[in-house]
């Protein structure tokens, strides 16, 4: 849909360049994103070593932004199971990287609050695009999890679609258990579904890693009436 490109004429100064600790996001070609991820990854490794926890990314290696990818997913494990998920949707936002409560404009090296992004693109366009994109993402991610889990002792592979559809329906209709640790709302209002939850056997790789893969749903507002 490409509406994220409507802000391409704005300069970083006009958009209000913000800072992350020790990193100025000032590159339009992706190097700033790679530097951000590299620094975050190194800090995560130090934290995991100090805490004695297992680093969830050790097996997969460092994720690097590539302009040819439509979607880039990366995840960091946290000790309480609350995960940060990065999603790069170039075919939705043009070149806006959305994570948690902020968005990174790859064209201008600018870090924006998600509210600023919504103000720029319009809530109706945002909802329409994200609804379409997340439907594909949920399916792709769930299928990938089912494939990874297709091992003796796993149960998700056999019931992946059934579980996915049931959980999405519960969230969309507001019927999910508010105490369910697999579902929570982030600070910017995104409804997240954990697909790793030992009690519900969504995904478990047999190891002892304390990590969760989240699918950001923006549920009721973005997925309902999708078709």
Task: Give the positions of each predicted feature.
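Compositionally biased intrinsically disordered regions enriched in Thr/Gly
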Residues: 1-227
């Amino acid at each position: 849909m490409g509406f994220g490109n409507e802000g391409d004429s704005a300069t970083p100064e006009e958009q209000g360049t913000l800072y992350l600790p020790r990193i100025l996001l000032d590159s339009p070609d992706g190097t700033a994103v790679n530097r951000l991820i590299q620094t975050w990854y190194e800090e995560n490794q130090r934290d995991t070593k100090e805490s004695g926890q297992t680093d969830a990314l050790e097996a997969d290696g460092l994720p690097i932004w590539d302009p040819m990818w439509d979607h880039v997913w990366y995840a960091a494990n946290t000790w309480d199971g609350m995960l940060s998920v990065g999603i790069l949707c170039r075919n939705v936002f043009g070149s806006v990287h959305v994570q948690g409560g902020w968005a990174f404009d790859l064209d201008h090296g600018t870090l924006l609050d998600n509210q600023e992004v919504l103000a720029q693109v319009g809530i109706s366009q945002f909802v329409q695009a994200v609804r379409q994109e997340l439907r594909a993402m949920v399916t792709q991610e769930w299928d990938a999890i089912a494939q990874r889990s297709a091992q003796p002792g796993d149960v998700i592979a056999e019931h992946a679609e059934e579980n996915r559809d049931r959980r999405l329906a519960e969230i969309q209709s507001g019927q999910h258990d508010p105490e369910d640790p697999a579902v929570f709302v982030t600070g910017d209002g995104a409804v997240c579904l954990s697909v790793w939850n030992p009690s519900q056997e969504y995904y478990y790789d047999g190891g002892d890693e304390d990590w969760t893969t989240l699918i950001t749903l923006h549920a009721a507002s973005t997925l309902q009436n999708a078709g």
